[in-house]
Amino acid sequence: MARVVPLDSASEAAATLSGVRAQLATVWLGAGGVLDLLLITVLAGGHVLLEDVPGVGKTTLAKGLARVLGVAFNRVQFTSDLLPADVLGGSVYHPGDGRFEFVAGPIFTDLLLADEINRAPTRSQSAFLQAMEEGQVTADGVSHPLSPLFTVIATQNPIDFDSTNPLPEAQLDRFLIATRLGYPDAAAERSLLGEYRSAPPLLPMLDPAGLLRLREQARGVFLHPDLAHYIVALARATRDDPRVRLGISPRGAIHLADAARARALLHGRSVVQAEDVRALLHPVWDHRLLPRQGREHDRRITAALLDELTAGVPLPR
C-alpha cells in the first residue's frame, strides 16, 4: 500500500516551497504562475519546455532556481554544429596506457538549461532526449547514471523557425510541462531598469537531500480513484475526434497525475483535488495535442481544441 503524506508534512513542505518561491520572486518579475509551474516540474521529477522569445529572463530564472534549490547547474547553447558528445560526454583514449576514460559532459548536473534546443541537429536532439528520458548516458556499452535530481529546462523560440529542427511529437511528449514566460507588465519592466539591479543575492532554501525528500512527499500525495478515472476520461476524449491527428498518450495522462500531486503539495494538501487537474490541463497537455488543421506550433489552436474536447467530461462527484 502506498504511503500517504500526512497533512502536517504537506503543510511543512508548502511552507518550505513558499520560501523558495519568495526567493525566486526577487529575480523573476513576471507572472507568478511560471514559478509554480517550475516548482511543480521539479517536484514531479519532470522536465519543462519554455517556448519564448529571447530576452525575457529564461537564463536568469533557471540559474536562480538552481541557486535557491541548492543544486548544481549547467547551461548548454544548442547550435547547428552541436555534437551528441558535446552534451553527453564520451570516451577519451589514453595512448600511454592504452585505456579509454569516460569524460562526462555538461548533462551530468542537477539542473540543465538546454537553450534553443530546436537549433541542434536531429541526431544531437535525439541522443540528448533519450538520455533525458532514460536518466543515463551509455558509452561503449557502459551506462553512466545521471543525477537523481536531473531536471531539464529546455527553451525554443516560437517565432524564429529559420534553420531549426522542430522537436518531433514523440520527443515533445517527454516534457512534463510546456509554457511561455511572456513579457513582464509595465511596472515590472520599470523595476528591471532600476532597483531590481541592486536586489540582494539569492539564498539557498534547500539542498539536494531536502529536494529528494520533497519529491518523495509529492509521490505520496493521494490521488482518489475517481480522479484517476477522470484523468483517463479526459485523455480518451482527445483520441477519437476527427479534428485530432494525435491525441494525449498514456504517458501524458501519467504526467498529468504526477503534476497534480506536485501541485497539491505546493498548496499544502495531502490529497489531489479536481482543481489541481484542471489547472494543469493546458501546461501539461497543450504541447502533446496535434490538430489536423492549423499551425502545429500555434498553442492557441491546440488550447482551444483541448477545451472543446474535454468540456463534456463530467467532474467526479
Predicted segments — roles?
Residues 10-53:
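Pre-Walker A (pre-P-loop) alpha-helix and adjacent loop at the N terminus of AAA/AAA+ ATPase modules
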Residues 68-96:
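AAA+/P-loop NTPase substrate/partner-engagement loops
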Residues 52, 115-116, 127:
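Walker B catalytic acidic pair
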Residues 94-99, 116-124, 132-208, 212-221, ...:
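Canonical AAA+ ATPase core
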Residues 39-79:
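Walker A/P-loop
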Residues 53, 87, 155:
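P-loop (Walker A) phosphate-binding loop of NTP-binding proteins
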Residues 2-7, 240-317:
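C-terminal engagement/docking regions of AAA+ P-loop ATPases
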Residues 203-256:
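Conserved AAA+ ATPase small/helical "lid" subdomain
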